[in-house]
C-alpha cells in the first residue's frame, strides 16, 4: 500500500520541480576605460612596429574586442600584413600574433 502512494508522490515532486522557469541570466558587461584602451593601442602599435620593422605611424589598429578575461586588438601594416595583439583582463600585453 505504501509503495502505491510513493510513486505518484515522487512523480508529482519531479513535475513541480521542472515546471519552475530558470532565472534570467544577464551577461556582465564592463564599461571600457578610454585611457586604458588608448594605452593598449599605443603598446600594440609599438610592439607591431618592432615586429614588422616599421614605425608606429605606419600601423593601423582597426578593431578592439573585449572577451570574458582578455582583450584583442586587430590591425595591419602599410604593407597590409595583419596582426592581433592580445591583452589580459588588466590590460597587460600578452603577445602579438601575425595573421
Swiss-Prot record:
User: Where is it located?
Assistant: Cell membrane
Sites of N-palmitoyl cysteine lipidation: 18
Q: Where is the lipid attached (S-diacylglycerol cysteine)?
A: 18
UniProt KW keywords: Cell membrane, Lipoprotein, Membrane, Palmitate, Signal
Regarding the membrane, this protein is recorded as: Lipid-anchor
Task: Please list which residues make up the signal peptide.
Answer: 1-17
Q: What is its main location?
A: membrane
Keyword Kinase: yes or no? no
**GO CC annotation terms, alphabetical:** plasma membrane
Protein name as it appears in the record: Uncharacterized lipoprotein YsaB
The record's gene field reads: ysaB
